[in-house]
């Protein structure tokens, strides 16, 4: 079995982004599984505060020594905060992807959109089958 964490309070995309909804603010990042697959992260491109994310669209990219991957929005809303620590030191995402390793905080347009994303159990089944 896998040693990856799948926090129950998150929703997941099959492209390995997660979203944590707290009222009308969503925190977005990538999963521990994604961090493991990427290896050493060397660059992170994130949108600016005030930018609009549209669910399903690309909002940035993450680059490792192995690959460059697009980041996909799990929810629609306006960026209200971005993790500047990760922009400066992207490798830090590996230390705590579900905590201090978040990418963006977004004021959501429709909180119910989060229900379209995978539950922790659905995501676990998806990645453990990969």
UniProtKB/Swiss-Prot annotation:
Q: Where is the Lipoyl-binding domain?
A: 25-107
Domain of life according to the entry? Bacteria
Q: Which prosthetic group or cofactor does it need?
A: (R)-lipoate
As stated in the Swiss-Prot or TrEMBL entry, residues carrying the post-translational modification N6-lipoyllysine are 66
- Which keywords fit this entry according to its UniProt record? Lipoyl
The family note in this entry says: Belongs to the GcvH family.
Oligomeric form and interacting partners: The glycine cleavage system is composed of four proteins: P, T, L and H.
- Write down what this protein is called: Glycine cleavage system H protein
The gene designation is: gcvH
